[in-house]
Regions:
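N-terminal interaction/assembly modules
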Residues: 1-102, 107-115
């Protein structure tokens, strides 16, 4: 069960915030975010495939940060079950995104080949 005090949820919140901020200005970032950014080209190609009707530069920056984190966790890190990662991404979209963010994030992640 996710709670606001869950350390994994807190880590994901901080990472989404960091990934979001980096799109606007240079700033110090934590090691986990650096690792994700090293895979940014790979992750962004997966996003383009999963949501072909939206170009990367047109996707809401909060949604983009959430997708980057979730796709990294799904395809690179692989330490949590896909259902957990997708559920957590949808929760983050509810917290940080707009009204359509949860369904957009869920739909895009549903199109990712992670087996």
């Amino acid at each position: 069960m996710k709670t606001p005090l869950d350390p994994r949820h807190k880590k994901r919140q901080k990472t989404v915030e960091s990934l979001f901020k980096i799109d606007f200005h240079k700033q110090p970032i934590n090691n986990y975010t650096k690792i994700i950014l090293q895979k940014k080209a790979f992750i962004d190609k997966k996003i383009e495939t999963a949501a072909p009707e939206f170009s990367i530069d047109k996707i809401n920056k909060v949604d983009l940060a959430i997708l980057r984190l979730a796709i990294f966790e799904l395809l690179v890190e692989k330490t949590q079950p896909p259902k957990v990662i997708i559920d957590e991404a949808v929760e983050l979209a509810k917290e940080y995104g707009g009204d359509s963010s949860p369904s957009f994030v869920n739909g895009a992640l549903g199109n990712i080949e992670y087996q």
